[in-house]
Amino acid sequence: MIETLITFIIIFGIIVAIHEYGHLWWAKRSGILVREYAVGMGPKIFAHQAKDGTLYTIRILPLGGYVRLAGWGDDKTEIKKGQAASLVVSKSEVVNPEAENSVSNIVRRINLSEHVELEEAIPMLITEYDFEKELFIEGEVFGEIKRYSVDHDATIIEEDGTEVRIAPLDVQYQSAGVFHKMLTNFGGPLNNFILGIIAFIVLTFVQGGVPSTTNAIGQVEKGTPAYNAGLKAGDKIEAVNGTKTADWNNVVTEISGSKGKELKLEVSRSGKSETLSVTPKKMDGSYRVGIMQSMKTGFFDKITGGFVQAGQSATAIFKALGSLIARPSLDKLGGPVAIYQLSGQAARAGFPAIVYLLAMLSINLGIVNLFPIPVLDGGKIVLNIIEAIRGKALSQEKESIITMVGVVFMLVLFVAVTWNDILRAFVN
């Protein structure tokens, strides 16, 4: 139980953290202010406020993660007319806060919280402000109306004590070029593909190499029909009962289809050909003789093998998606419960199985996130493409409606898949 839980949390944490970091990295490279980078959902169990204005958090529920960008959704701190605040301005002005305001007055921090006290802060009753374009704040200070310039990177301490940076238009998501928006949205899936490839490369090194497709035997297990028949590592099986076997798949097909009958193997050994007789036995549900295929153990063979396995996994996922579209069924989908079960199986099987599961799930997440469904990365990229074609973005109201439709759809699907996983795990 504990082993399964730890494995699940590690796999989930790595996949989500890498995915969200892809969004964060491209957003920052595009000049977009990242409010928060979160792994998990729900209440925070860890938080760190970085100097660049990004809050890094780990949250208690392993149900996903997110990157909150400035200008995305409900991002603004509401300040009411007449609201009390305290301002920290440039040091030269703090000495005499009643002096005439000048252009050099720069506000660094704006405190709206009654629970936070700032040293040498100027009290103000706010009457007007603009933190997006003109960057100023105006209000009553010691009985006079004062207007202060606000620093581009100034922070606001909200009523609950949370300190956030203001977001001028130039650092908001909407102000980024459409290409940079697309990179920001594609960054998550891209990182999942990279993680999947790296995990498969690690797996090839752990396994000692990449399975070769040739008809050469890599290893013969002792006490098996092949061992008793005299087969050795390095032998090439050229034919089975007269049927040519050009690669390993041909060899496996002929042996597994024998139904336990004696086979005549034409073997090439050290340039010489000989025929050996072997009778397959049923092992783990199929007929086998106890031979293993040879491995490519070169450094670059292992590297390229990781790429090949990643490509094969992606192909298998696309085939599964095609089957799902042709014949929709919840049994073909899996949510957190199914992933938890797979994590338990991988933990019991050992480290290679854990790495394999990590690779498969990462590539799976990358592909699924590119579906053109609002709220998923693919849906956001579609909106970016529409913006590129139209020459302007959809209004925030329209984008919000489209996103809400996607949220409802994904929420209903999530509940249905999770319930089906529970029934499959505990009822069936």
From Swiss-Prot:
A molecular function (GO) term: metal ion binding
InterPro entries the record matches: PDZ, PDZ_6, PDZ_sf, Pept_M50_Zn, Peptidase_M50
Name of protein: Putative zinc metalloprotease LL2128
The PDZ domain, residue ranges: 188-282
PANTHER family named among the record's database cross-references: MEMBRANE METALLOPROTEASE ARASP2, CHLOROPLASTIC-RELATED, REGULATOR OF SIGMA-E PROTEASE RSEP
EC numbers, comma separated: 3.4.24.-
Gene Ontology cellular-component annotations: plasma membrane
Recorded family membership: Belongs to the peptidase M50B family.
Subcellular location: Cell membrane
PROSITE patterns assigned to the protein according to its UniProt record, in alphabetical order: PDZ (PS50106), ZINC_PROTEASE (PS00142)
Residues annotated as transmembrane: 188-210, 354-376, 401-423
Membrane topology listed for this record: Multi-pass membrane protein
GO BP terms: proteolysis
Cofactor list: Zn(2+)
First-listed, main subcellular location of the protein, grouped into a coarse class: membrane
SUPFAM superfamilies reported in the protein's UniProt record: PDZ domain-like (SSF50156)
Pfam families linked: PDZ_6, Peptidase_M50
Active site: E20
Residues that, per the record, bind Zn(2+): H19, H23
Keyword vocabulary terms for this entry: Cell membrane, Hydrolase, Membrane, Metal-binding, Metalloprotease, Protease, Transmembrane, Transmembrane helix, Zinc
Species the sequence originates in: Lactococcus lactis subsp. lactis (strain IL1403) (Streptococcus lactis)
